[in-house]
Every structure is written in C-alpha cells, then in structure tokens.
Regions:
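Conserved acidic segment of CheY-like receiver
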Residues: 2-14, 18-22, 52
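Receiver (REC) domain active-site loop signature in two-component systems and cognate sites
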Residues: 58
Length: 84
C-alpha cells in the first residue's frame, strides 16, 4: 500500500532533505509540500494524503495550531510533528 505524504515546514532545505529520504522508501510518495500552516490549510480541501510531516515551530500558525485546524476538517489524517 502506498502512503501519500505531505511535508509542512518553513525551511525549504529541511523539506528537500526529508523528501529525498522519503522518496527512497518503498511505498512512500510525497504528494505535496507547504511552507506554512496557512498554505497547508489552503491546500487541504482537495488534498489526497495519508500522512503529514509537520514542523512544530513555524511563523504564523505553528504546528499545534495547524494540526488542530487540520484535524477538525480531516480527522482521518495522521500528523507527525517534527522540530529541529
């Protein structure tokens, strides 16, 4: 079964590195990226994803606020919070 993954982090270097790692994993496909919580929430209505890797510390909406709003709309999402 293929896992469709979205990356949400304000640091493009981190998103690029994580995407590179995930693309080497069998059964994983990165289907979207967002540089902010607001950008992620805007893409949520049409998003087909199973898992979200979410940065905790972002400007604007942080990871906790974004996760709360996302799960209110899509309780089926699995969100993994990251911080560096």
């Amino acid at each position: 079964m293929e896992r469709k993954i979205v990356l949400v982090d304000d640091h493009s270097l981190f998103r690029n590195g994580l995407r590179g790692l995930l693309e080497r994993c069998a059964g994983c496909r990165v289907v979207g990226e967002a540089a902010s919580g607001e950008e992620f929430l805007a893409m949520l209505p049409g998003l087909e994803a199973d898992v979200v890797f979410m940065d905790f510390a972002m400007p604007g909406l942080d990871g906790a606020q974004t996760t709360e709003r996302a799960l209110a709309r899509r309780p089926d999402l699995r969100i993994i919070t990251l911080s560096m």
